[in-house]
Swiss-Prot record:
This is Rho GTPase-activating protein 15. It comes from Bos taurus. Pfam families: PH, RhoGAP. SMART domains: PH (SM00233), RhoGAP (SM00324). The keyword Transcription does not apply. Coiled coil: none annotated.
Amino acid sequence: MQKSTNSDIPVETLNPTRQGTGAVQMRIKNANSHHDRLSQSKSMILTEVGKVTEPISRHRRNHSQHILKDVIPPLEQLMVEKEGYLQKAKIADGGKKLRKNWTTSWIVLSSRKIEFYKESKQQALSNMKTGNKPESVDLCGAHIEWAKEKSSRKNVFQITTLSGNEFLLQSDIDFIILDWFHAIKNAIDRLPKDPSSHSRNLELFKIQRSSSTELLSHYDSDTKEQKPEHRKSLMFRLHHSASDTSDKNRVKSRLKKFITRRPSLKTLQEKGLIKDQIFGSHLHTLCEREKSTVPRFVKQCIEAVEKRGLDVDGIYRVSGNLATIQKLRFIVNQEEKLNLDDSQWEDIHVVTGALKMFFRDLPEPLFPYSFFEQFVEAIKKQDNNTRIEAIKSLVQKLPPPNRDTMKVLFGHLTKIVARASKNLMSTHSLGIVFGPTLLRAEDESGNMAVHMVYQNQIAELMLSAYDQIFS
């Protein structure tokens, strides 16, 4: 045996030819090994000229993590619908009135809530201290309306939550505040009116997310190497998959027969098994069902207010507790026996709030969409007598449920105005409250501020010239 001078690896000395060949092979091998080590060292430092590679993560992600990252985007990106700066003032907390204090806030609207930040959300999150969270407003069951009478500023609307919190939002730029109003209103309309339904949906949402995570984890574990007993159970499942498929087909067939044979909605309604709710029903449908031209609930509310609310300060202007109003709404929709003299409806502002909500929830307002432009043209006339005659002519053309309900409502409001010295509610104040509620354009995207002026003026004229219009 002989050792090479350039290597510690022994080389056999059989014959010169073989020895020479072995030395050549050894040199080639050593050179290749040295080249491989050099390449490997370079690959650990540089991938391209002048470009440093990122450190290799030692964490091994499983299959479910890859799926969650690639398929499911961050929840915040899915939920945020709109964000930007607005002027904000909180005027009530849990039903307790607060002093109005306007501040500039960065507002983030998601599908179920609004968050108020003092700065943009990105800056707020980066600067946020532990426990310092933005103010959050749950939109489920909330109510949004224009609140011209609540502030001297222009373009102000109010959000009232189920918990009794009230916020004013404002911007001097018309199209910005209009865009925000419709975005928030659409978000509220998409949510269930019943708070218990909202909580059930929330729980279902959590269950679905947790189930999807478990499913991904289960899928990931199945991709790993299986033990023999697992293979046997897999074969057992495959063996019975054919029978499972036939069972599913039988279930589908039975469901299809059940769906095709079930009675129509009209049949169920005719038999009285399904009834439309009071709130949110078309006025003519509700009156036809009750065999009257004025809804029973409207007459009950007016009777209660005239019995114990004519002299109450700010009647119809002051908001009642929204949670109690929603409770009253639920009872009315269930067509349970309603007694507004009950102690739980002691606050008359709850009754007036429910009455205003009834008119707001009408699919078509008390002044029908088809008459909106005609009423606006009538109020534009210069001569007061001409305006009154034009309005009177239009009122007489309205469908009986609209005309009769209008007559009863405005007749009631004239009694409120007659006690203005005590309740401080003038014709102008009631016009501001009821104008946008009873009269609105089908498409509110244009000239909202101009329409609001006409809405108030029409409501005021209906009150001031009530005897002439409804004579």
